[in-house]
Structure formats: C-alpha cells, structure tokens
Swiss-Prot record:
One of its GO terms (cellular component) is ribonucleoprotein complex. GO terms for biological process: translation. It comes from Rickettsia prowazekii (strain Madrid E). It holds the Pfam family Ribosomal_L9_N. Binds to the 23S rRNA. This is Large ribosomal subunit protein bL9. Belongs to the bacterial ribosomal protein bL9 family. One of its GO terms (molecular function) is rRNA binding. PANTHER family: 50S RIBOSOMAL PROTEIN L9. The lineage of its organism: Bacteria, Pseudomonadati, Pseudomonadota, Alphaproteobacteria, Rickettsiales. Keywords: Ribonucleoprotein, Ribosomal protein, RNA-binding, rRNA-binding. Transmembrane segments: none annotated.
C-alpha cells in the first residue's frame, strides 16, 4: 500500500513523504490514526499544495510540546503501593497510572499511549520512563514506587547521592 504521511512518524518519515508500507500497517494504524492518507493521484496533488500548511501546524504543535516538555522533565512521580515481603507489588504500575498522575501534576492531558515503558513496573524502586509527546521529542521522567512516603524519600536520597558520586568520579 502506498501512503502519504500527513504527520511525522518516528522511524518512518516526515510530512509529505510518499511511502510503501504493509497493507495491514497502513489500514490498521496509519490511516485510522490520521497519520497518513492513501497515495492516490488526487491526494498527491493535494499534498503538494497543503504540505506547507501541514508543516506549519506541526511546527505549532512542536512548540507547544516543547513548552510542556520543559515542565515534564523535572517531574518525579511517587506511587505508594502495597507490596509483599520481598518488595513485589500486588499488581503493577501501568502506563495509564503514570499518564494519569503526570496529567494531574502538570494540568495537561497526557495519553497513556505517550508513555513508553521498557518493562512492567512490578517492584519497588526508582525507574526512568520515556514520555513521547511528539515524533521527534521525548522526555524522561523519574518514577518512584515505594511502600510509604518515607521509603520513597529514602530512594530519592539514594539516587541523589549516587548522582553526586558519579559527578565526583568524572571530575
């Protein structure tokens, strides 16, 4: 299937690119998410005319996302959860939990699909989580999972001490 991208897609292309993609990928992801349109003759002519508009709209979105990104990058999200004796959670901290808490903290709606978890969070500790609000822009947020507020503060102190040690070693 041949498609024309109308939004930048990470690892695929930028606005206006004409690509051949698998039929299923095009039908089930790119077209429903309004990331691309079918590459018909009329759409190719239309995209040439509207490419500038799409790029301007993307530029505005990117500027807004950069402002949000400056707020997000300093966030430390603390989750207090019940655990077993060996610090395993009863359940897990999901990307939806992280999105909800982050949205509440910064007063901006963040979708759970923007949260990129390397693996499920199923035990206490400090985790770094990637937030992707734009195809070309990512943020890193610190997530602390603990049994109590005091334990969470201990984790944060340990991390700060380790960071200071790393700085001393490199100096």
């Amino acid at each position: 299937m041949e498609v024309i991208l109308i939004k930048p897609v990470r690892k695929l292309g930028k606005i206006g690119d004409i690509l051949k993609v698998a039929d299923g990928f095009g039908r089930n992801y790119l077209l429903p998410q309004k990331l691309a349109i079918r590459a018909t003759k009329s759409n190719k002519e239309l995209i040439v005319k509207q490419k500038y508009e799409f790029e301007e709209k993307d530029k505005q979105v990117r500027e807004e996302v950069e402002k949000i990104n400056t707020i997000i990058k300093d966030q430390q999200l603390v989750f207090i959860r019940q655990t077993s004796d060996d610090c395993k959670l009863f359940g897990s901290v999901t990307n939806k939990d992280i999105a909800d808490k982050l949205s509440k903290n910064i007063s901006y709606n963040i979708s759970h699909s923007n949260i990129i978890l390397d693996k499920q969070i199923k035990s206490t500790g400090i985790y770094t989580v990637e937030i992707r609000l734009h195809a070309e822009l990512t943020s890193i947020v610190t997530v602390v999972v603990a049994r109590s507020e005091s334990e969470a503060q201990d984790y944060l102190r340990e991390q700060k001490a380790e960071t200071l040690e790393d700085v001393d070693e490199t100096a």
